[in-house]
Structure formats: C-alpha cells, structure tokens
C-alpha cells in the first residue's frame, strides 16, 4: 500500500472492508496481533489519509442516484471538478481521458431533489460544453472491494453475522444528524458520537441499533487506492441485452478489479457503468477478453482512464490519492 505500509496494514484494511465496525479486540484476534497494535495501525492509516470508515445508506433507505457526465471546456476540468466536489449530494468526482472528460455520481433522497441537481444545478456550473445523465437503478458492487490480504479462515472469522431484520424505519432529523457525524468517522465511539450530536449516549446507542437493523444505515471502509498498488482506474460503459444485465453485473462483481458496477437507465445504448482498479492500463485488455468469453453479447461502448480522482464517497482526495478533507454526503440537503 505504498511507503510505510506493510502486509499487516493491508490485512487490517481488508478486515475492516468486511466488518467496518469490528472492535480492535476482534481485529487483533483475527490478525493474530495485540488489540493495541491493531488500534495503533488503524490510527496511523487514518491520520495519513490512507484509509477511513464512514456511514453509508443501507439497502432499505429510499434514495435516487445518477451518473452525470460532462465535456469540459479546455482548461476548465479542474475548476469544474472542484465545484462539483463541494456539493454534498455529489459523492464522487473524476477527471478522465476522452471527450466527456468528467464524470460524477450524484445521490439524493428523492426524485425531485435528484432532478434539481442534474437538470438545474450541475449543468449551470461554468466551464461545461455538454452534459448528459443516466439514472443508476441497480447497484451490483460499490462498498466491498478487497485487497486479498486475508486467508479464507480469516475472512470467515471477521465477517459479521447478518443483523436480525426489523420493520422499516423512516429517517428523521436525528437520524440525519447521526449519518452526517459518522461521515467524518464511522468508527466514532458512542460517547464521541453522542457529544457530536448533542444527545444522551444511551439514546444514540439505541437509535444506531435501530437504524442498522432496519437496513437504512450501513458503513463502508475505503482506502487510498493509489497507495495500495492499484494506481490505475478506468471507467467502462457497456451495452448488454436487457435480460442479461443482472447476469453480467454478477459476473463483474466477481472480478477482483471491479470497484463499482451499476445498471444504468435512460443513458442511451449503455446500460452498465463499471469502474475498475488496475496495476497498469495494459491489464484492462485481459479483463475485457475474460468478460467477452463469459458473455459474448457484451459490447464495450466507451473506455476512459481516470487521470485525477477528486472525491470518493465524500472524501476530498489529494493528488496522491489520500484523503485530505471531508464534504459529508448529504442526501437530504437543499439544492
């Protein structure tokens, strides 16, 4: 994972991918180190911007999301990307090769909010020649990309049991406060989280249990992928026969290179958007050949190499890929 990062750090990040809220006692047991060692290693990864845990929408939380692509005027891409990155509903921003040299992922609590973003606010930003958007309608992969640092036994040991499901819960202002506080650090202690939102600790503990068991709140672990030995990111737009979209999505999820894979609706011929993390650009051709062999009907419509990633799930990234600041992802913010 770059200078100063060793196999234990890789294994620690991998364990937290599988179980973002695992205690340091659990992590130490799985990794066969003292809990204090696991804690010290994690604090160093966080303080240097190499890894972080943050809140994320659970599978039962109602939301809408879109892919927004733009062709920027010459010399304007960086300024446009900075403006995009400052918007709380824009959770990822990347500058790429190709005519459409910027893409962003946008998320909102409902369709009117999403429309206000992709129809009104984003296209009005100065420096754009052309824009297009598509709804993201089915997520195949996005929060569980791993480094391969754990043995099968360690994977089984650290993977949590599925939470017992309870009836649906509608998000309120208290829930939003918790979600936004946990954007900064998803592993905040109950005491620190209670202080951040100004509520009693027992109340915070009960509400978090409710949100996670209701499936409206989840957590994700991210890392500086450039630092992890995967410096090359590519984005592909695929055209797949409608009946095969789910099968192709499931196949792509199995590939270790796949970082994010989603079904698109309303984006023209393209109906799958996938990003991949590679050691080198030359590694892409074997991946495409593998996919074509498994699904001969898949057509690759567009391939772009990411030149600069400015934002990833709310984290503002430096040129070295490390987190340098946070713009909390806020689905409910006014546009």
Regions found by a protein language model. Give the residues of each.
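A compositional/biophysical signature of low hydrophobicity enriched in polar/charged and small residues
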Residues: 1-335
């Amino acid at each position: 994972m770059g200078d100063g990062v060793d196999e234990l750090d890789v294994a620690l990040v991998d364990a937290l991918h599988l179980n973002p809220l695992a205690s340091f006692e659990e992590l130490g047991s799985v990794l066969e180190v003292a809990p204090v060692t696991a804690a010290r290693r994690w604090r160093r990864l966080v303080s240097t911007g190499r890894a972080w845990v943050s809140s994320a929408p659970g599978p039962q939380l109602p939301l809408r999301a879109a892919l927004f692509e733009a062709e920027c005027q010459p010399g304007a891409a960086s300024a446009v990307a900075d403006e995009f990155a400052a918007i709380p509903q824009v959770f990822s921003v990347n500058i790429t090769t190709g005519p459409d040299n910027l893409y962003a992922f946008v998320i909102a609590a409902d369709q009117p909010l999403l429309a206000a973003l992709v129809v009104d606010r984003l296209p009005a930003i100065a420096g754009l020649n052309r824009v297009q958007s598509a709804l993201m309608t089915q997520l195949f992969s996005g929060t569980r990309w791993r480094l391969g640092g754990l043995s099968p036994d360690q994977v089984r040991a650290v993977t949590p049991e599925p939470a017992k499901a309870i009836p649906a819960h509608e998000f309120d202002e208290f829930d939003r406060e918790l979600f936004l506080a946990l954007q900064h650090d998803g592993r905040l202690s109950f005491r620190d989280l209670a202080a951040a939102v100004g509520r009693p600790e027992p109340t915070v503990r009960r509400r978090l249990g409710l949100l996670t068991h209701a499936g409206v709140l989840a957590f994700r672990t991210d890392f500086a992928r450039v630092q992890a030995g995967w410096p090359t990111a590519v984005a592909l737009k695929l055209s797949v026969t409608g009946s095969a979209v789910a099968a192709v999505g499931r196949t792509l999820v199995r590939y270790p290179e796949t970082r994010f894979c989603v079904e698109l609706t309303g984006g023209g011929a393209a109906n799958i958007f996938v990003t991949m993390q590679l050691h080198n650009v030359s590694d892409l051709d074997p991946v495409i050949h593998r996919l074509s062999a498994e699904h001969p009907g898949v057509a690759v419509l567009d391939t772009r190499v990411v030149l600069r990633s400015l934002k990833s799930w709310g984290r503002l990234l430096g040129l070295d890929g490390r987190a340098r600041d946070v713009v909390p992802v806020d689905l409910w913010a006014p546009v």
